[in-house]
Amino acid sequence: MKSVWLNLPVSNIQASKAFFKQIGFRENPMHAQADHMASFLIGENDFVLMLFPEYAFQHFTQTAISDTSKGSEVLINLDAQTRMEVDELADKVKKAGGKVFAEPSEVDGWMYAMGFADLDGHRWAMLYMEMDKMPK
C-alpha cells in the first residue's frame, strides 16, 4: 500500500476551496487549476484531502451521501503543536464561515482541543496533547 487519502463530498467546490484555504490548508499544486474537484495537503507528511462534488462522490461510493445535519459519518482529527494553534484554528474557522461546535478547552487534564464543522457539516477536531501529563 503506497498511501492513503481522504475523499469528502461537498455541495460547492469553490466555496469549500475558499474555506479550507482560509483555515490554512495548503492547496495541492497538482490539482490547483481543477474546477471539478479540490485537493489539499495537510500536515508535515502531506496527508491528502480530496473534495468532490456530491454527484461525483455518490458515483464513486455507489451509495447515498450522509446527511451531516442528522449525524456524523467521521471525525477527522488534526494534531496541533501548541495550544495557540488550536485557538488560532477556531478563530479561522469562524471567520471562514465554519461552525465551531466545541470551543477550545482542556480535556482530561492533558489535552487541549476544539471541534468544528466545515461548510458541508463534516466534523473535524484539532487537539494538542501534553504527553507528559497523560495518565499512565
Per-region residue spans from a language model:
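N-terminal beta-strand motif that seeds the catalytic metal site of vicinal oxygen chelate
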Residues: M1-A18, E73-L78, M129-K136
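Residues that cap or flank secondary-structure elements
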Residues: N7-L8, Q81, D108-G109
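Core segments of cupin and vicinal oxygen chelate
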Residues: N7-Q58
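Alpha-helical elements of the RecA-like P-loop NTPase motor core of helicases
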Residues: K17, H59, D87, W124
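Vicinal oxygen chelate
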Residues: S39-F40, A90-K136
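A short, acidic/glycine-rich surface segment
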Residues: F57-T63, M134-K136
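Short, flexible turn/loop "capping" segments at secondary-structure junctions
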Residues: S66-K70
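Mid-chain, well-packed structural core segment of small domains
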Residues: V74-V93, G97-G98
